[in-house]
Amino acid sequence: MFNDQSKTTSSVKGICATTDNNHGNLKKTNSTPFRKNYLLNGRTKLKLENFAYNASTEISSPKISEKKHSSLPIKRKNTFNESSTSFSPFTKAHKEITDDLKPDKSFTRKSDLNSQDMPVCFQETSKDLCRSSSTQHLLDHQTTDSTIIDMKPVSTNSKSDVFTLYTDETVLLRRCASDNKPLINNNLSSSNVSENQSRSFGSYDEVKNQGNNLHKVPSLVSIIRNARSSEQSRIAANSSCLLKGSDTEIDEDDFALEAEDLAALDSLERQYSQLPNSTVTASAKDIEKTAKVNHVGGDLQSYCSATKASDATINEEPVNLALDKACNSLPDINSDFIDDWDDSCDGCTPGELCEFSSEYTVLEVHEDFIFHEGNHFRQLKLILEANDILHQLFLRGDWTETSIFVGDSIRVEATFDKDNTAIVDNDKGLIIIHPKILMSATAVASSFPCLRKAVISDRVGIYGPPTKAMVTGNILHDFFQHALYRGIDALENVDINLETSIKTYISDIYFADLSLDEIREELDARLPLLKSIVERYLISKKNDNNNESIHISRLLDIEESIWSPRFGLKGNIDATVEVVLTEKPESSSTLTLPLELKTGRYVDNISHFAQSLLYTLLISDRYGINTNQALLCYLENSTIKNLVASNSQLRGLIMTRNSLAQHNFRRSLPEMISNRKICDHCSLVSECLFFQKMSDKGVANSNGLTESWNEWMREVKDEDLEFYKKWEKLLNQEERLLLLKRGDVLTFDTEELEAYGKTLYPLYITKEDIVCLEIDDRVFHYKFAFLNDNGYPRNFLHSGFSVGERVFISDEHGHWSLAKGHIVHIQDSCIEVRTRHRLHIPWLKMPNFDFKKNQVFFGNYEDSKLSFIGSNHTRYRIDKDEFSSGIASIRGTLMSSVLPDAPLIIRDMIIRLKPPKFCNSALIDPEFLKCLNEDQITALKKCHAAEHYSLILGMPGTGKTTTISSLIRSLLAKKKKILLTSFTHLAVDNILIKLKGCDSTIVRLGSPHKIHPLVKEFCLTEGTTFDDLASLKHFYEDPQIVACSSLGVYHSIFNKRKFDYCIIDEASQIPLPICLGPLQLAEKFVLVGDHYQLPPLVKNSRTSKDGLSLSLFKLLSEKHPEAVTTLRLQYRMNEDINSLSSELIYGGNLVCGSKTISQKKLILPKAHLSDGLPDSSSSLHWVNKLINPSHSVIFFNTDDILGVESKTNNILENHTEAFLIEQAVSSFLERGVKQSSIGIISIYKSQVELLSKNLKSFTEIEINTVDRYQGRDKDIILISFVRSNSKNLVGELLRDWHRLNVALSRAKVKCIMFGSLSTLSSSNIVSHLLKLLEKNKWIFTLNENDIATKFDENSSPIKDCSQVATTNNAKVIIRKNQRFFNSDNLCEKAILPQLEF
């Protein structure tokens, strides 16, 4: 946005300019050039050279017209001033993406391109304008600073009148690929490169004669740059959540231009800047020839060497009038969804759906005009890339209003010709933008008439109590689906079935503040309408009085969940049915159609039509048929409508879906509609106006609602709004990464997904168990086993999946999310998933199937036909369900925290950080202070004395759980109501276990499969039933303690209950915005944690550094240390182990709680087996050190045994350390140590999986990452540091002292570490640890004899140390290729590499 209407300073990636807005002239000023350190390797340089010297074509320089003519301005929807509002919703989000992902501002380059010498011709108008009118604002308001695009006269020769257009001089779009980089001016220059640095590429004439392609160099460079950048972003996205243990050390390889590359590039740029202006005259005979102006087939290299400029046709008509006509003739995308909706076809039925298309990346977006039948028409030309093949796509008609950005991913439902060119217009074809973002059909349909409301609804999680309409609607839906399944039998025993449904929804009735009589009255009034529908459309087709043309003959599925990346849609269809349609008495057809039931009072609603027609696309994709019809059932008038989708309607719906996806991807908002009539009745009007106020535009002129709203918002201070802006920006950044990661599941190769622990494939079903519930409700349990095509055994226990995890099941044919559920059991050979939807094969057709007249499938309810379920013919895949991040709910809580009605404790204590107050004394029954130490007693007294909040810093092993349970008991004695929450379910349950047996009642909220068996008595399960509302009210409202996870506070019970105290355990692991939800529900709060251990887990490393990893606990403890009570006495570690964390992290403040704890040592039940151990001169001296109880801490240095790491596909492993840990485990077990007493920790998940695989026979040994081990402990802990390399690279994870602190504080009597002393010393924090270990003589350096003679000839990885060459070169080769053992056979010989001397 421009802050100065007269003059603006712009800085965009290498151009610093001042612009006079009145004239639009760009005047270059001095700027300091810097280079972005991109990697251009030797292959890149060769590409550039081949590109510059391609002699396949010879192009002569066209003559330049000397004739001067007056300029005619092009009509454009956007202007370069602040008042421009067209399509501005993307501007702010685009700016945020730029802030988040652009290179450092210091990396700018001064352009040497002279505005008078820039070669531009009319057929390159599209390259210069770069955008459709709907997205030109991104060039108008580009990056973080405003950009003024220089519009200069460009001459064009023609036999007709010669005229001049204004076009952009400098804009050359970069490919922004999948890392969401924004559009930026890519101006390359040769400044600051001396002649002796650059290689001569010959004169301009020489280059011209060999093929003048130099003007394409910037595009090639940008593609190469972003290909590298995109790959890094993708790797970082998958690595950032620590899957496979990657530490995102993607920049270990130098990522910079070498001097020779710089010289070559600058030489090309210099020649590029010397090219003369050119003019080209083009003509076209008709519209189709105009479309195929470029031959873009082939790969990227051919694109760089052979792509020519686009042709365009211009007639004698004045350009401004032609453009006026073209722009004004475009219809509005919502024109098909006005009040006079036409259910009939518009004369052009949708053709057969194209074959499932590839996903393309948009490399270039050009805007130009075509001439047809005496008129100019606007079109967009896209250059696309898929699998290194370039394609050209032309968008015409309504599609020119589509917002498309360079770097967007799209799917194309159109046929490409042999030249890889296709056209999408109003007659044929579709494009799907960001198909991996699955927009729900309901959300798309709800965007009529307000697109902004649909976006806000998705952006902000609004959780209110259920309403009467919702409850009755759900019951009626169930009854209707039961009728579809049972037919005429459903009309019998209606009263009994009705009462059963009421019991099923009794919780919703309670939370909606309804009585059972109210519900019965409402249902009694509407059930006759439902019966009428059943009798007219479901029962006998040959009824005497049945003249309906629609007969539902069979039910295929209920609540069918369909995900369609093909159309970028998802939806839950009320019913999928087979319908007999009778157009004429003698003619009928059986079709498979979606059926949507609407139980509300409003009929013929436009959003209902839109939702139903979108379901036709989902059905077409799932069942492999071409259908354009849907059934819409209105209970209010007992009718079923057969809707027929026309091309124009589907086109409008897909374009609306694309707009929603683009706003979702760029985190932007559409403009307000400013319609008082609509806004008065909008449920999200407050959120809408709040977002408007947060934008730079304010709400002053939004609409007539603002006066009262502004009065209300006067209570909100600027610091409150700044608080919201800060955290909302961080949430957006985190959400953006999660959005990309969700899409990865739908597109990535299964091998890569399996490597990151996200997917299991290929699987087949071994068993199906069905549990019948009330009415027709059923639960299904499926057991899956791996289908081992290659004969390689695979183990589910090491797959990265765990019990309780939410998953969805798909098949190998691209039918996504056939069922959702959670894992209930895992064994090495099978995995069991519980789901409420039966797995079936939707595409399985009956023998008499016909695509047009008899679309009959087996369906989900043909039990006799489901014998194929257990066969191996269908391969399934299980994916982790990461599509529900909860960020929308967190954003809604964040917003409510700054509004005027937010609790004062939030606004004063958290936002404004006022100091907490404490009363002078607090009375506590001494009974609750028994068995507590001095620190714990002080903590309890401070919590009781707090008027606002109190903090408890619990160091490792200091008894935080015991302190919390004692605090709760003391508060219960004072009749206080308590909300107990934590970051994990396990922490909540550990506290509740200690509270079992107390007099007060407890209610535990959460999914039963995530709750510890010992506390399931406190929660609702499927077997829990209530006969009346009074007993349900007693269950929810009487208990003094309500317990849930930190994200479980969006339960409906919290609309009814408030608390005296909120106690949050693990508060140092919870991001600040998440803490706001629980704290809004209580008058006071107590936070318990340790910010010296693991901070909040944030997926996006950039967001973490920007502050999202800051916990409320850390913020308050540093701002107001007087509120903190520290627990210093620990009861876990002996003195030696305690000294590690105490001296490194806590400044000596962590001390043993008793002498017994301090002196505790390892007990070996079979210690006599150690009597014959060799002395210190023996090669097995390391085993003696290992098991010696007096050595509580020991570090085994692997530098001298070639224990190097291996890194494949960004997966880090160290087989040497894994080998040593196996031997250590065997040594302990041989001497009687229990498996359950041993724990193994690694920083990297890939190493954890390697160890788990190699130790799979020891099922009671817990092997996990540091993150999973927080809050747990073992007698013996073995730590694998993994990193060992010649470059001494340790990665980011080993620079994190929080993580190191957790690893070192898990052991009780024995802490054993394996690692490379030389490599780990390069980490500052680990080097301090090593110095401490060296000081205490706790380091033992292993040598080759320690492992070489341990095994006999048949099992030795390296039989004899003489096999290992001692020269430096040989060692390097071994270190690079060493693999000690095969994961399936610990004693298998390694194949030694060929040594070179």
Swiss-Prot record:
Keywords: 4Fe-4S, ATP-binding, Chromosome, Cytoplasm, DNA damage, DNA repair, DNA replication, DNA-binding, Endonuclease, Helicase, Hydrolase, Iron, Iron-sulfur, Metal-binding, Multifunctional enzyme, Nuclease, Nucleotide-binding, Nucleus, Phosphoprotein, Telomere. The modification Phosphoserine is found at S134, S219. GO terms for biological process: double-strand break repair via homologous recombination; Okazaki fragment processing involved in mitotic DNA replication; removal of RNA primer involved in mitotic DNA replication; replication fork processing; replication fork reversal; response to intra-S DNA damage checkpoint signaling; telomere maintenance. CDD domains: DEXXQc_DNA2 (cd18041), DNA2_N-like (cd22318), SF1_C_Upf1 (cd18808). One of its GO terms (cellular component) is chromosome, telomeric repeat region. Phosphorylated at Ser-219 by cds1/check2, leading to association with stalled replication forks. Binds 1 [4Fe-4S] cluster. [4Fe-4S] cluster binds at C450, C679, C682, C688. It comes from the Eukaryota. It catalyses: ATP + H2O = ADP + phosphate + H(+). Its EC number is 3.1.-.-, 3.6.4.12. Residues 390-808 are annotated as: Nuclease activity. ATP binds at G954, M955, P956, G957, T958, G959, K960, T961. PANTHER family: DNA REPLICATION ATP-DEPENDENT HELICASE_NUCLEASE DNA2, DNA2/NAM7 HELICASE FAMILY. Belongs to the DNA2/NAM7 helicase family. Interacts with cdc1, cdc24 and rad2. This is DNA replication ATP-dependent helicase/nuclease dna2. It comes from Schizosaccharomyces pombe (strain 972 / ATCC 24843).
